[in-house]
Regions:
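PLP-dependent aminotransferase class I/II
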Residues: 1-14, 30, 66-171
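Active-site phosphate-binding strand-loop segment of PLP-dependent enzymes
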Residues: 1-55, 60-68
Length: 171
């Protein structure tokens, strides 16, 4: 469940703190009808096999500033820059060999991308099924005489639209 992300965002702005939203287990969740991951400076999402959608492995980072986008693009490709501005800065170097950051090989394969894109199209359906499953579990436990007083469930605030990967149960 989402905290009041607007309050967190506003606090971060006042204190000049970069807000990175970890949404690895809440892809598709919303706060006040706006997707989580879009309130901060960066939003992270996971496509691990057990999450809301999968591409087998990997994930996604979103950001608001073009400068941050260029840095992230470089980091995911061994620190390599494909930016024309960098090429102009080092005209005597072959741009295929200009590495401006330490980086990683985090580029998805074409197959992973195709799987991920097809899964994105089903995200809202998956989110709806997970919500229905949560309700079925809660109703089943509440209707069982043996268990109905053993479990307590967290109420979902009206301004939150979860994307359940898991949900808390209080014993």
């Amino acid at each position: 469940l989402s905290p009041d992300i607007k309050k967190i965002r506003d606090y971060c702005k006042r204190k000049k703190i970069i807000l990175i939203e970890d949404n690895c287990e809440s892809l598709g969740a919303k706060f006040e009808k706006k997707y989580l991951g879009t309130y901060g400076d960066f939003g992270t999402f996971s496509f691990f096999y057990s999450h809301q959608i999968t591409s087998g492995e990997g994930g996604m980072i979103i950001c608001k500033k073009k400068e941050d986008y260029e840095i992230l693009k470089s980091l995911r490709s061994h620190g390599w820059s494909r930016d024309e501005k960098t090429s102009r800065k080092y005209p005597h170097l072959d741009p295929r060999y200009v590495f401006i950051n330490s980086g990683f090989n985090l580029r998805p394969t074409d197959i992973q991308a195709a799987i991920g894109i097809s899964q994105f199209k089903k995200l809202e359906k998956f989110r709806s099924i997970r919500s229905e499953n949560r309700e079925k579990i809660i109703n089943s436990l509440k209707s069982n005489a043996k268990w109905k007083n053993q479990f307590h469930f967290i109420d979902v605030p009206k301004k939150v639209s979860p994307s359940y990967m898991v949900f808390p149960i209080i014993l």
